[in-house]
Amino acid sequence: MSQTIRRPSRIEGVIVPPGDKSISHRYAMLAALANGTSTIADYSSGIDCQSTLSCLEALGVIISATGEPDRPGYSISVTGHGLGSLHAPDGPINTGNSGTTMRLMAGVLSGHPFEVVLTGDHSLRRRPMQRVINPLEQMGARLDAEDGHPPLTIRGNKLIGIDYVSPVASAQVKSAVLLAGLHATGITRVHEAAPTRDHTERALSAFGAEVSHTDGVFGITGGSPLHPIDVAVPGDPSSAAFLATAAAALPDSDVTIDGVGLNPTRTAYLDILRRAGADVEVSVEGVGGGEPYGTIRVRSRTLAHIAITAVEVPSLIDELPVLGALAA
């Protein structure tokens, strides 16, 4: 089977992007640790996010779905029984290709009193895990991974809060430590090497955890019970970036993106488009689950070459490919 794709001369219209993947992971995990049933509308249908649901189900969490993925009315219900309530699985848990699932669940499972093995596909088994192992072992868990790569064996334990200075700018490392901090005694703090996505901190607050943020230092008080919530996942800004960039580049284009996440740690690509000369309008329409959302409108203009600095790269990690296409 083959398809011919023709470059349009212009694009125009209104789109609603699929649910954000990063936020979907975090809402599902925290719902599994809350005491009660949470409803998560517009949960991402991406394979990685489905890996998170499969992982939680293997740990005894009850999850059900209503409607069809990526269609209006789609939602999942996740029933949790509080911190420390996950059950030992029957065997190793395969997280597929999802590094987010493995690293964040390592933090969650470090505070549970059983052994679990997290594995994945060939690609995931080549990714580094030592950056997550180090802080979790400082908190009291025991983790083993040959040469720092999966499979990852986690032996949960009673955890203590730590002050962790992260050597890398990584939202996943920060998230793993904060999720472990939920189960620790005292306060756990993470000092960021550079600003990263803050979806975990926002979600923790939405579920009722005690979270603080001062000058690049994020803290969480252990033992705070989480309450269930009903929430909608905003549209994925990284998916929106492709059509936004196309609208900026193709003459006479005008695209509106509704219901999209407008978290400031995810909208740097809009600043790049503006600097290049595109007409970009952003309207924040509300906040749900700690996440701002709204509308983006992009209209084409004559674009100019620009430079992207090294400091900007961490906040553009998903959008760099399409911005590179724009530069071409």
Which role does the model predict for each range below?
Residues 1-328:
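Structural preference for solvent-exposed beta-strand-turn elements
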